[in-house]
Amino acid sequence: MSQNAGLLSYRSVFISDVHLGTKDARAEYLFDFLSHIRCEYLFLNGDIFDIWKMKTSRWQWPLLNTRLLQRVMELAAQGTQVVYVPGNHDEFFRDYLGSELGGVQIHREYRHTLADGRKALILHGDEFDGVVRHSRVLKWIGNAGYELLMGLNRISTRIRRLLGKGYWSLSLAIKNQVPNARTYIEKFETAAIRHAREQDVDVVVCGHIHHANLRQDGSVMYANSGDWVEHCTAIIEQENGALELVNWAKESADRLDVRALIQSLPVSAVARGKDRRPVGSGAAHS
């Protein structure tokens, strides 16, 4: 039996918006997902790290985050072409465009040919966000509201775990009821599709807005991989070039035991805030 026996096989996998470094990153689900797949291409489409949060005293780095990055390196070592397109929360890595770090290529955007011949443009998506590009005040207000939503989401997640229930995003359910949020998403998608037409590509793949979607608009397919904070979603390319949206929180609901996964790690260490000691090798952080 080969080491890849029993794994889900895809041609390409697109993930974005993991926000490692924050307490809301669902690293356990992404680690589980990457542990169950093999692929020719893995696209890390921005905001994999949250450098904004890591510059404050409120960042967190559980050992599971390190194991997750090791899994990415394992895939690269096994022959997967890993491409990292930094976003606005990890724009630090935009200083290294054209470089290769640990087998991971770093690009501002990337053009990928699907197996069926379609041309895909991969970019994070903050290029289309008027809030990020034009208004610091609106961005601050939005971030404050988002912090509140994610706080409620953490409480909901803890309660559901105590009740033995699977992951469900309270914050997402609330956002779906806000008309302005839906309008913003529609405008973002329209801007991305327009950009794809201007660039003469068949598919635009982005992230950024934490709203997974896959839809055809005339000659252009819009693909948003969502996030691993609220959705736990990815876009996958099958061997024939077909694109699909995967919700791993639902896919793994009957199987994934988060507590068992975390406890299986050799050290249950967590680095927080101003604690700069190295994580791992025996020292637990509180």
Label every PLM stretch briefly.
Residues 105-109, 126, 130-137, 182, ...:
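Conserved beta-sheet core of the metallophosphoesterase superfamily
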Residues 17, 47, 87, 124, ...:
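Active-site glycine-centered loops adjacent to acidic/histidine catalytic or metal-binding residues
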Residues 11-19, 54-58, 173-180:
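Short, basic, glycine/proline-bearing loop/turn elements
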Residues 113-116, 216-286:
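Binuclear metal-dependent phosphoesterase catalytic core
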Residues 12-14, 42-44, 121, 205:
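Residue-level marker for buried hydrophobic side chains located in beta-strands
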Residues 2-11, 22-115:
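Core catalytic region of metal-dependent phosphoesterases/phosphodiesterases
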